[in-house]
């Protein structure tokens, strides 16, 4: 192998790494933007829900009760999602252990 082949190989590896990093950065940015879209869609839904519940005849106390109830509902949903994520994480760990055992049994 001569120096020009080594240089080409080296630059090919550098280009591969650059492209790989850029792709990963784009994936992170896309994921971040999707999260922002979801968050803003939720805010729009929340405001629409408020418009549906709040009427001109509501007192300030009535509006506060509506907002408190909606807040409690959303907090309950967050708790449910936290529990579901914990269950999914536990299942993922168990599957990872099983896959590791399969790999070890294949090597033996």
Swiss-Prot record:
Range of residues in the leader sequence: none
Q: Does the keyword Zinc-finger apply?
A: no
Instruction: Tell me where it resides.
Output: Cytoplasm
Identify its protein family.
Answer: Belongs to the pole-localizer TmaR family.
GO CC annotation terms, alphabetical = cytosol
Instruction: Name the gene.
Output: tmaR
* Major location (coarse): cytoplasm
List the protein's name. Pole-localizer protein TmaR
What InterPro entries does the entry give?
A: DUF496
